[in-house]
């Protein structure tokens, strides 16, 4: 999260994959890697899409996150700022649920990463 959100090389690779018809998948705090990706038309990749992420309420209330002060930004806030429809345990029926929107597959619950991979495989078949 600290080094991927503003990594321009990574953003370029992700944008090229998506714009070439590829599938992008993220889990846990991994949604930070796509939050600032811009497509060739200048729009954010996440704009208008449902993306699973940790809720601000978790980040700001948990001691392991130092009540949000340890993090460079709150993923839910940044996703919403960039036009996404952030999804999390407060909006999903199950925190381990996988969200698929267009060709972006996401989960807020890192142990669901295998389910993200399965959905990605289904999308490329």
Feature names for model-found ranges:
Residues 1-25, 29-125:
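Active-site-adjacent pocket-lining segments in enzyme domains
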């Amino acid at each position: 999260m600290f080094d991927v959100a503003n990594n321009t090389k990574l953003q370029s690779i992700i944008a090229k994959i998506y714009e070439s018809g590829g599938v992008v998948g993220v889990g846990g705090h991994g949604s930070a890697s796509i939050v600032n990706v811009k497509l060739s038309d200048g729009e954010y990749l996440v704009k208008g899409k449902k993306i699973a992420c940790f809720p601000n309420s978790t980040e700001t209330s948990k001691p392991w996150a130092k009540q949000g002060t340890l993090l460079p930004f709150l993923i839910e806030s940044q996703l919403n700022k960039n036009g996404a429809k952030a999804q999390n345990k407060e909006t999903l029926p199950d925190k381990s649920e996988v969200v698929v929107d267009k060709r972006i597959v996401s989960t807020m619950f890192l142990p669901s990463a295998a389910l993200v991979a399965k959905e990605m495989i289904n999308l490329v078949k």
